[in-house]
């Protein structure tokens, strides 16, 4: 009996810690005045499974919603971790793929739809063509979730959100809260991809307007641009002078002109495999790679944000996580037909 009481006390302590962490995140997100999100340590995040505690107590596996959701989180994380371990660059690609989905008519998985004889999707837009990647990782993660969590339908839009969060975790050993419940659009918006996505040649005014249209202020715009602390840009993009910060033209390691199929890559900052503050350090020095990057130094508000994140990695990670949570909850456009796709690249 004493042994059982001791085990029960320990288990309840674990549950109390988990609920305290969840409450902290929920209270932070719901506060109308919040500017920062307290990051969740990786040992106490969305993969915490109540079934572990119940099993420890001898009550068997739980069939509750928490356990079902965590099955999905675990199934997606397994694939994402393996993909990034095999190729670090894939982490940046998955964050970008989620961004490019959500910024066109909300987080609806529209970017994943392939063209057909009767349908032209978003993948051929200039911002996406020969640029966004990671589709096969999303497909694998979706199949893994379908196989291991058959009782919990998960949308492709959900998989994108989870994959981006897990990429952030893989880079930083920090995480943030993602909930399930998104649905997939039965259509995509090529025109929207051409007009709503930020472009490397956008000046500060245009960038500000595009982010404001999605409900983001300039500080949030700057912190989301900080995703350029990881990943690469293609020489095919950089050889177009309007895309490149001209301060970098003399040292650009590309052979220009470059064809659309050119495979040359340049790191978006000096440490493209590390989620750090070097991106912001480069902006302050006038050495941002893209024209749109360096434009963030053109107003008092954006300069203040850039300097904030240059000086404090913790503030960068916290604010980035909060902005990603906000972005991951951008709703689909009104009137769009929704479903949960069986295969992410085509409608049911």
Swiss-Prot record:
GO terms for biological process: hydrogen peroxide catabolic process; response to oxidative stress. The record marks 96 as: Transition state stabilizer. Disulfide bonds join 71-149, 102-107, 156-344, 235-256. The keyword Isomerase does not apply. Residues 1-20 form the signal peptide. Belongs to the peroxidase family. Classical plant (class III) peroxidase subfamily. Substrate binds at residue 198. It comes from Ipomoea batatas (Sweet potato). Its cofactor is Ca(2+); heme b. InterPro entries: Haem_peroxidase (IPR002016), Haem_peroxidase_sf (IPR010255), Peroxidase_pln (IPR000823), Peroxidases_AS (IPR019794), Peroxidases_heam-ligand_BS (IPR019793), Secretory_peroxidase (IPR033905). PROSITE patterns: PEROXIDASE_1, PEROXIDASE_2, PEROXIDASE_4. Removal of H(2)O(2), oxidation of toxic reductants, biosynthesis and degradation of lignin, suberization, auxin catabolism, response to environmental stresses such as wounding, pathogen attack and oxidative stress. These functions might be dependent on each isozyme/isoform in each plant tissue. May contribute to protection against cold-induced oxidative stress. Ca(2+) 1 binds at residues 101, 104, 106, 108. This is Neutral peroxidase. GO terms for cellular component: extracellular region. Induction: By wounding and cold stress. Induced by acclimation and repressed by chilling. Binds 2 calcium ions per subunit. Binds 1 heme b (iron(II)-protoporphyrin IX) group per subunit.
């Amino acid at each position: 009996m004493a042994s059982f009481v001791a085990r029960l006390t320990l288990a309840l302590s674990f549950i109390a810690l988990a609920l305290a962490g969840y409450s902290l995140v929920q209270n932070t997100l719901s506060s109308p005045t919040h500017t920062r999100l307290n990051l969740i340590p990786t040992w106490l995040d969305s993969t915490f499974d109540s079934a572990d505690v119940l099993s420890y107590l001898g009550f068997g596996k739980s069939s509750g919603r928490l356990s079902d959701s965590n099955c999905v989180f675990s199934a997606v994380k397994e694939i994402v971790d393996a993909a990034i371990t095999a190729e670090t660059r894939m982490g940046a690609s998955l964050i970008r793929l989620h961004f490019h989905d959500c910024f066109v008519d909300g987080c609806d998985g529209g970017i994943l739809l392939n063209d057909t004889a009767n349908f032209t999707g978003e993948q051929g837009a200039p911002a996406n063509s020969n640029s966004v990647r990671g589709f096969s990782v999303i497909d694998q993660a979706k199949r893994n979730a379908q196989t291991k969590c058959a009782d919990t339908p998960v949308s492709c839009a959900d998989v994108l959100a989870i994959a981006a969060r897990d990429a952030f975790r893989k880079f930083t050993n920090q995480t943030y809260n993602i909930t399930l419940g998104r649905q997939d659009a039965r259509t995509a918006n090529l025109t929207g991809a051409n007009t709503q996505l930020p472009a490397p040649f956008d000046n500060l005014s245009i960038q500000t307007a595009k982010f404001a249209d999605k409900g983001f202020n300039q500080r949030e715009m700057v912190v989301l641009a900080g995703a350029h602390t990881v990943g690469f840009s293609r020489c095919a993009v950089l050889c177009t002078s309007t895309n490149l910060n001209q301060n970098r033209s003399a040292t650009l390691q590309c052979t220009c002109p470059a064809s659309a199929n050119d495979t040359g890559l340049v790191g978006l900052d000096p440490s493209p495999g590390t989620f750090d503050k070097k991106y912001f350090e480069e902006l302050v020095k006038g050495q941002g790679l893209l024209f749109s990057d360096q434009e963030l130094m053109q107003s008092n508000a954006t300069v203040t944000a850039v300097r904030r994140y240059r000086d404090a990695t913790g503030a960068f990670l916290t604010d980035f996580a909060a902005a990603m949570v906000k972005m991951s909850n951008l709703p689909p456009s009104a009137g769009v037909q929704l479903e949960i796709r069986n295969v992410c690249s085509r409608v049911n």
